[in-house]
UniProtKB/Swiss-Prot annotation:
This is Small ribosomal subunit protein bS16. PANTHER family: 30S RIBOSOMAL PROTEIN S16, SMALL RIBOSOMAL SUBUNIT PROTEIN BS16M. Signal peptide: none annotated. InterPro entries: Ribosomal_bS16 (IPR000307), Ribosomal_bS16_CS (IPR020592), Ribosomal_bS16_dom_sf (IPR023803). GO terms for biological process: translation. GO terms for cellular component: cytoplasm; small ribosomal subunit. Keywords: Ribonucleoprotein, Ribosomal protein. Gene3D superfamilies: 3.30.1320.10. The gene is rpsP.
Length: 82
C-alpha cells in the first residue's frame, strides 16, 4: 500500500484550513485517511502551523512520500532538512 502525506481541506467556503494527514494514494483528497499529523491554517495572521514531529518522522521512515506543499511545511517546521 503506497501512502502519501498530504493536506485535507477543512473549514468554511472561502476560508480554508487544512489537516496534515497520511492517506492511501488512491483515497480521495477529503476522504479516508490513516493518521492525522497536524494542521495548517493559511488564512490567519501569522499563519498557523502545528505538526507532531514524532509521527511525521515515523511515517517518513516507513516510506510515506509527502506532497510538494507538505514537504515545504515540514521544512518550515524543522522536521525535514532541505
Amino acid at each position: 500500500m503506497a501512502v502519501r502525506m498530504r493536506l485535507k481541506r477543512m473549514g468554511a467556503k472561502k476560508q480554508p484550513s487544512y489537516r496534515i494527514v497520511v492517506a492511501d494514494v488512491r483515497a480521495p483528497r477529503d476522504g479516508r485517511f490513516i493518521e492525522e499529523l497536524g494542521h495548517y491554517n493559511p488564512t490567519t495572521e501569522p499563519v498557523t502551523l502545528e505538526i507532531n514531529e514524532e509521527k511525521a518522522k515515523k511515517w517518513l521512515q516507513e516510506g510515506a512520500k509527502p506532497s510538494q506543499k507538505v514537504r515545504s511545511l515540514l521544512t518550515q517546521a524543522g522536521v525535514v532538512e532541505k
